[in-house]
Amino acid sequence: DLQNAIHADYGKHPSETDITEIYPCIAEINHTISHLRKWMKPKRVGTPLALFGTRSELRFEPRGLVLILSPWNYPFNLLINPLVAAMSAGNCCILKPSSKVPHTSKFLKTFISSLFDEGEVALFEGSSAISNDLLKLPFDHIFFTGSPKIGKEVMAAAAQHLATVTLELGGKSPAIIDQTADIRKTAERLMWGKFINAGQTCVAPDFALIHQSKLAEFLKESRAILMSRF
């Protein structure tokens, strides 16, 4: 199953897989089901005076064929959540998981095949060469999660076909701690956010900007929390 596949790829604990991979996808699916009818509804917009007597509205239509390229650090979450969004908008999808998670990719191949016809959703396993070949094809939209370096290559490939792109390229996440902070609670939450998934999270806190008067206490509490957990 998924827990075993992810553990085989990089040792992730089953409980952590539940918390960071499965539950977020269930929440995304439920949120989409609850709001999709409202999202699909056409929106009235203003009409230019030159077109007086007419009615204007925005209608939401599928892009067409979507390519989703997912990373290794959250191989289920960061593949399925974009898939939920793309399919709920009426698109067909091609999926390419990271080559660094072969066991998870194999699980996903079986999982996706059991749910969808290949004409609706198809998943390709394999090396980065497969991704490069896919990027040569005329997709209507490309969703990529990964590094800025590869993101530039994805954007350049998309430009050849005037495809739109969604690029999630990570970033820096500072924590700002002032003199009013509850240091015990702050340290506990920051250590959880920093070390979940062994720190391999795009929004994990990278550094803290802390009031000088709270620095010693913060370091003490952080060390104690890490020692108790690891």
Where in this protein do the model-derived segments appear?
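ALDH superfamily catalytic-core signature
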Residues: 116, 149-230
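Short gly/ser/thr-rich secondary-structure transition/capping motifs
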Residues: 45-53, 123-126, 189-190
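Conserved small-residue-rich beta-alpha loop and adjacent elements
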Residues: 47-115, 162, 184
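N-terminal Rossmann-like NAD(P)+-binding subdomain of aldehyde/semialdehyde dehydrogenases
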Residues: 1-57
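A structured beta-alpha segment of the ubiquitous adenosine-cofactor-binding alpha/beta core
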Residues: 55-57, 123-140
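Short beta->alpha connector loops at strand-helix junctions that form conserved
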Residues: 91, 96-98, 125, 145-146, ...
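A glycine-rich helix N-cap at a beta->alpha junction
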Residues: 117-123
